[in-house]
């Protein structure tokens, strides 16, 4: 009934309707009963200070509520409020109980954690104690081993001393025994010698008589043997001479035997030369694609693949300038059509700086034309001496036996085909050169000759007159260098990184940009030097711990290659023009010298100091339009352009 006192009012009470208003207080009603009693003081007890006004209002409100039409609803509202309070109290009680249970579980968990930590600490202490005990046991065991080792060493030392003493005693005994035996032997020999000498002195006459009798008997035996043999041979020869049939048969047999011996000797030599020309390989040939019987027996699968292979593109794997590509492609097409139509092959000269692809083009030309190729070097001819002429004839005889046609490639031809008038060459080398000129003087439908040289101006004039086509291989420019870098980067880095068992790894960076940058930094380098740079990338990756090729490693290899190239140029410059050594870029056309704008270029410095002369773009072409020779020098060994010449 708390609503009677004006407490616990909420939204539910408002929904049931407002309670009836309290009646207004009557004036003079408060304390009226007290005034009727007079001024007599009220008795003082525990209820003396109690104010019954609230009870009166409550009783009045209860009476009014009983007569009100909302009495039942108010009662229900009061009951519902009481139930709500009870439910709230019960929920709080449940929460208190849950909190108590949670507190108990936390206490149990804390106890378990403490117990676990205690067990862990006990375990750790046990392990530490066990380790300490094990350490003590190991130390005791090691001390025992050391003591045992010391004891064994002491015993071994004593045994060695004992053995040494016994060996010394035995050696002394043996020496004494040998000494006594030697004395006894000497005494015995001396006694026997004395006895033998005495016996010989006493029997000297008998011994001489025995020697005389033996010599007489031997002489009689030899004389009788000679007489008997002479008689037998004489009778046999007399019987042979008197019989004409035997004499005729003997003469015919000896004649046939001599004819057979000489015929077999000559036939064997002819057969050997035929087999060598057809099946063997001349000694001057270093490498050939021509199939021999021995090679077919050793590698039948590879030989069958080569026989079934189709002609390849002449420029596959070869990077050249566009103008040079067009020219060599025309040469390849002409050579292939010449083979198809069984025409006469032309002789070709490939000249230019080293490492520009001359040998590779010769191989590709042979494979593209369906011909066999054979590679020889000019430096192998001079050491042969007197055998050079025979070897040269064998080489061309072997070339004429090719059914598919043979491309004979001579690398470093300037080492052999030098000028006979000015160069000091031996008589044997001169004879070999004459034999070579004889075979080169006429065209053939069996072979074509391809010469490669870095110094073609040293050729004999007879060689120059026999050359049909001259092709100049130049150093690669920016575009060709970038193509070369990409080609060798793909062959030496990308393919090993994705194929094969022993793979190398490649870091992530812009490969195209890096190839372009390397092509820019390798200005002046040949194709061979760029290929060596790619191989150094691969070797650096294999030499690293993780096998990863990074951009920094590539940059280091490029810097090293550039430094090596500059060092080579310094060496080349130090040789000087009088030593017969030329700069790789000298004697070439103007488009190659575009990177040499000033003579102060550090790659080819002027010996006279600072120089401002420019290079003639017509140098080495023979087409200089100026009034002066383009071979003029600035005074420091640096050629410059005379007035009227086009400059680079």
Curated annotation (Swiss-Prot):
One of its GO terms (biological process) is mitochondrion organization. Its main location: mitochondrion. Residues 17-26 have a biased composition (Pro residues). Tends to be down-regulated in differentiated cells and re-expressed in pluripotent stem cells or cancer cells (at protein level). GO terms for cellular component: ficolin-1-rich granule membrane; mitochondrial inner membrane; mitochondrion; plasma membrane; secretory granule membrane. Residues 1-54, 111-134 are annotated as: Disordered. Residues 69-214 form a coiled coil. The modification N6-acetyllysine is found at residues 427, 495. The modification N-acetylserine is found at residue 2. It is a peripheral membrane protein. Residues 2-246, 265-648 are mitochondrial intermembrane. The keyword Secreted does not apply. The keyword Phosphoprotein does not apply. GO terms for molecular function: ATP binding; ATP hydrolysis activity. InterPro entries: AAA+_ATPase (IPR003593), ATAD3_N (IPR021911), ATPase_AAA_core (IPR003959), P-loop_NTPase (IPR027417). ATP binds at residues 352-359. Keywords: Acetylation, ATP-binding, Coiled coil, Membrane, Mitochondrion, Mitochondrion inner membrane, Nucleotide-binding. Residues 247-264 dip into the membrane without crossing it. It comes from the Eukaryota. Residues 32-48, 111-125 have a biased composition (Basic and acidic residues). Pfam families: AAA, ATAD3_N. It is found in: Mitochondrion inner membrane. Forms heterooligomers with ATAD3A. Interacts with components of the mitochondrial ribosome, including MRPL11 and MRPS18B, and with other proteins involved in mitochondrial RNA metabolism, possibly via interaction with ATAD3A. Interacts with GADD45GIP1. May play a role in a mitochondrial network organization typical for stem cells, characterized by reduced mitochondrial metabolism, low mtDNA copies and fragmentated mitochondrial network. May act by suppressing ATAD3A function, interfering with ATAD3A interaction with matrix nucleoid complexes. Belongs to the AAA ATPase family. This is ATPase family AAA domain-containing protein 3B. It comes from Homo sapiens (Human). The gene is ATAD3B.
């Amino acid at each position: 009934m708390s609503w009677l006192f004006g407490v616990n009012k909420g939204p539910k009470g408002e929904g049931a309707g407002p309670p009836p208003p309290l009646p207004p207080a009557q004036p003079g009603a408060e304390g009226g009963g007290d005034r009727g009693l007079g001024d007599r003081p009220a008795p003082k007890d525990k209820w003396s200070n109690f104010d019954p006004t609230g009870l009166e209002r409550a009783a009045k409100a209860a009476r009014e509520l009983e007569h009100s039409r909302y009495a039942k609803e108010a009662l229900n509202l009061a009951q519902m409020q009481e139930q709500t309070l009870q439910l709230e109290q019960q929920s709080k009680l449940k929460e208190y109980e849950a909190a108590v249970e949670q507190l108990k579980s936390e206490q149990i968990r804390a106890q378990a954690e403490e117990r676990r930590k205690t067990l862990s600490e006990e375990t750790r202490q046990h392990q530490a104690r066990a380790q300490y005990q094990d350490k003590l046991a190991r130390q005791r065991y090691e001390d025992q081993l050391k003591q045992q080792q010391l004891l064994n060493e002491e015993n071994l030392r004593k045994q060695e001393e004992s053995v040494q003493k016994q060996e010394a005693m035995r050696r002394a005994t043996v020496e004494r025994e040998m000494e006594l035996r030697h004395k006894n032997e000497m005494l015995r020999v001396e006694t026997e010698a004395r006895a033998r000498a005495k016996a010989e002195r006493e029997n000297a006459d008998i011994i001489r008589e025995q020697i005389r009798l033996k010599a007489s008997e031997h002489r009689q035996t030899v004389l009788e043997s000679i007489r008997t043999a002479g008689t037998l041979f004489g009778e046999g020869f007399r019987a042979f001479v008197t019989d004409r049939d035997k004499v005729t048969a003997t003469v015919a047999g000896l004649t046939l035997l001599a004819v057979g011996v000489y015929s077999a000797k000559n036939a064997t030599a002819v057969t050997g030369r035929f087999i060598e020309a057809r099946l063997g390989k001349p000694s001057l040939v270093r490498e050939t694609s021509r199939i021999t019987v021995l090679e077919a027996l050793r590698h039948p699968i590879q030989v069958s693949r080569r026989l079934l292979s189709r002609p390849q593109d002449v420029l596959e794997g070869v990077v050249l300038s566009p103008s040079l590509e067009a020219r060599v492609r025309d040469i390849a097409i002409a050579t292939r059509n010449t083979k198809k139509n069984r025409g006469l092959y032309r002789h070709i000269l490939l000249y230019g700086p080293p490492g520009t692809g001359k040998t590779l083009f010769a191989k590709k030309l042979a494979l593209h034309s369906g011909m066999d190729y054979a590679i020889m070097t000019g430096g192998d001819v001079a050491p042969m001496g007197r055998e050079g002429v025979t070897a040269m004839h064998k080489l061309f005889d072997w070339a004429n036996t090719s059914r598919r046609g043979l491309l004979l490639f001579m690398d470093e031809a300037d080492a052999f085909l030098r000028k006979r008038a000015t160069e000091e060459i031996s008589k044997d080398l001169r004879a070999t050169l004459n034999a070579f000129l004889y075979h080169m003087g006429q065209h053939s439908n069996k072979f074509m000759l391809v010469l490669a040289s870095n110094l073609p101006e040293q050729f004999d004039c007879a060689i120059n007159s026999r050359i049909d086509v001259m092709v100049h291989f130049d150093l690669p420019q920016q575009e060709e260098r970038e193509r070369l870098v990409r080609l060798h980067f793909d062959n030496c880095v990308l393919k090993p990184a994705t194929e094969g068992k022993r793979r190398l790894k490649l870091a992530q960076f812009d490969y195209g940009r890096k190839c372009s940058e390397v092509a820019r930094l390798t200005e002046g380098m040949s194709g061979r030097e760029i290929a060596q740079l790619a191989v150094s990338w691969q070797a650096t990756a294999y030499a690293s711990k993780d096998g990863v090729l990074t951009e920094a490693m590539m940059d280091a290899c490029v810097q090293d290659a550039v430094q090596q190239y500059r060092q080579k140029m310094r060496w080349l410059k130090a040789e000087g023009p009088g030593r017969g050594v030329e700069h790789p870029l000298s004697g070439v056309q103007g488009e190659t010298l575009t990177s040499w704008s000033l003579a102060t270029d550090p790659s080819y410095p002027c010996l006279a100091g600072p120089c401002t002369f420019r290079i003639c773009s017509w140098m080495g072409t023979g087409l200089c339009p100026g009034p002066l020779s383009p071979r003029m020098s600035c005074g420091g060994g640096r050629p410059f352009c005379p007035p009227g010449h086009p400059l680079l």
